[in-house]
Amino acid sequence: MSWSGLLHGLNTSLTCGPALVPRLWATCSMATLNQMHRLGPPKRPPRKLGPTEGRPQLKGVVLCTFTRKPKKPNSANRKCCRVRLSTGREAVCFIPGEGHTLQEHQIVLVEGGRTQDLPGVKLTVVRGKYDCGHVQKK
């Protein structure tokens, strides 16, 4: 190693860290075969569950109904409701179709499936189940 390389290492260690000695090798090394055998395969982090916590549908009680405005290129008032799920969690759900008669304290079935133009709305009310009626034909 030349003097210029040593001085460059000393210069970077002075500016980057508290050590006055030049760093000649990396402090973080790869695991040896013995360490990998002893520790086993690396643990994967658990999959993040959605608002239904891995279930296809959940029952919930309507707390209030309201309208939300969609994101930029779309313009409408989307009908939504705040629901207390059977897991104890509260969530905002989209009510599909035209017209609904949902009121406070009614029981609904919700399923996963976000509404693309409503930020934060990740659940959809199932029409025709419990207190939420079918969409009326014209």
UniProtKB/Swiss-Prot annotation:
Description of how the protein assembles with itself and partners: Component of the mitochondrial small ribosomal subunit (mt-SSU). Mature mammalian 55S mitochondrial ribosomes consist of a small (28S) and a large (39S) subunit. The 28S small subunit contains a 12S ribosomal RNA (12S mt-rRNA) and 30 different proteins. The 39S large subunit contains a 16S rRNA (16S mt-rRNA), a copy of mitochondrial valine transfer RNA (mt-tRNA(Val)), which plays an integral structural role, and 52 different proteins.
Signal peptide: none
Subcellular location: Mitochondrion
Mitochondrion keyword on record: yes
Primary localisation category: mitochondrion
MF term (GO), any: RNA binding
Interval spanned by the transit peptide: 1-29
Originating species: Homo sapiens (Human)
Coiled-coil intervals: none
SUPFAM superfamilies with a match to the protein in the record: Nucleic acid-binding proteins
Protein family membership: Belongs to the universal ribosomal protein uS12 family.
Domain of life: Eukaryota
Protein name per UniProt: Small ribosomal subunit protein uS12m
Stored InterPro entries: NA-bd_OB-fold, Ribosomal_uS12, Ribosomal_uS12_bac
